[in-house]
Amino acid sequence: MQKKKFKITPLERAWILYDVGNSAFVLMIATLVPIFFNALAEAGGVSKVNYLAYWGYASSVVTVVTAVLGPILGTLADTKGFKKPIFMLCLFVGVLGCCAMGAARTWLPFLVIFIVAKIGFSGSLVFYDSMLGDVTTPERMDMVSSRGYAWGYIGSCVPFVVCLVLVLGSGAIGMSQMTALTIALFITAVWWLGTTLPLLRRYRQVNYVEVEQHAIRQSFVRIGHTLKHLYEDKQVFWFLLAFFCYIDGVYTIIDMATAYGTALGLDTTGLLLALLVTQIVAFPSALIFGRLSAKYPSSQLIPVCIAAYTGIAVFAFFLTQQWQFWVLAVLVGMFQGGVQALSRSHFAKIIPAEKSGEYFGLFDICGKGASFLGTMIVSVGSQLTGSANVGVGSIAVLFVIGFVLFRVSCRTEHAKQV
C-alpha cells in the first residue's frame, strides 16, 4: 500500500523532468558560468573584489526584474489557457539566452545576456511551481515536490559531468577553454529544452479563472485585490515574510558559491568537484526529507533546515581553505533540497488552488526576488571590508529572522485550526 501511494504518475513524472532540465542550467550558472565571466573580467582588467561585486549586482538586477514581473505574469497565467503559453515564452528566452552567453567575448555583454537568460529561467519557475496543484493532489505535494528537487539534483549531473570533462580536458584535445565553455552552454540549453518536452505535451491547466474581457488589465486588478487582502490571511502573510528571509540566504549561497570560492583564491577544479558533490548529496537528502514529510509536517521539518543553514553561513565566515569548501558543499547538499521542496509544497497547500499562479508570483518575489538583498549584502560587504568572508557570513542573520517569522506563521495556522 505504501509503494502504491507514492507511485509517480506520468503527469507527475513529466513535471519532475522539468526540474531535471532547469537544474542543469542552475548548476551551470553556479559553476562554469562564473569561471567564464572571471576569465572575461580578468581580460578586461577587473579586480577580484570587483569581479565578485559585479556578479552580485547582475544577480540583483535579475531578482529585481523578476520580482516586478513575477506576480503580474503569474496573475495573468491563472486565466484559462494562459499558463502554458507564457511558461513556454519564458522557457525559450532562458534556453536561447543560455546559448547566446557562449557567443560573448567581453565581460559587459556577457553580463547583459546572463541577466536576460536568468530572467527567462526565473519567470518559467513562477509557472512551473504553480503547476504543482494541477499535476498532483494536496496529500502528495510534499513527496512530488521533493522528488522534483531530488531528481533535478542528480539528473543535472549528467550534462554537467560531460561539460566538466570537456572544459577541464579542453587542452588535451587542442581546444581553447573558452570554446569548450561555449559548447558546454549549448549542451546545457539542449538538455534543458529536451527534458521539458514531456511536460509541454502532457500538461493541462486544471485550476484557473475564466477568461475575461481585457484579461491583462484584469490581471492587475486581481493582484491588487490579493495584495490588499493578503494580511487578512495571516498564515500566508507571515509565511511569505519568513520565506523572504530564509530562502534569500539559501539562493544567495547557491548563486554566489563558486564566485565566493574563486574570490578566495581556491582551486578551480576543486571548486567544481565540490559543487558536484553538493548535487550528489542533495539527491538522497531531498528524497529523505520527502519521506520524512509522510511522518512529520513541513511546519516541523522546515525549521530544521533553516537552523542548519544558519550554521552553514557562520561556517562560511571562517572559510579559507579548500577542504573547508568541501565540507560546506556537503552541508549545503544535505539541506538545500529539503528547504526548497518543502517550502514549495507547504505554500501550495495553504493557498487557493485557482489562484496558484497569482500566489506563486508573490512566492517568487519572496524567493528569487528576495535574493536581491542577500547578493547585495555579499557585494557591498565584500567591497567595504575587502573580505568576501564578511559578506557571506553576515547572511546568517537572514536565517535567524526567517526562523522566528516561520514559527509565527505556524502558530497562526494552529490558532486558525483551533
Predicted regions and their residues:
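Helix-to-loop junctions at the C-terminal end of transmembrane segments
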Residues: 68-82, 284-298
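Helix-loop junctions at membrane interfaces in 12-TM secondary transporters
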Residues: 101-114, 317-329
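Juxtamembrane intracellular "pre-TM" segments in multi-pass secondary transporters
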Residues: 2-12, 204-241
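Glycine-rich segments within core transmembrane alpha-helices of 12-TM secondary carriers
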Residues: 145-167, 364-374
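A membrane-interface helix-boundary motif in multi-pass transporters
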Residues: 48-51, 167-190, 380-399
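Multi-pass alpha-helical transporter architecture, strongest
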Residues: 191-202, 393-418
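Structural signature of the two symmetry-related core transmembrane helices
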Residues: 85-100, 300-315
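Helix-loop boundary and gating motifs at the non-cytosolic
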Residues: 5-63, 235-267, 271-274
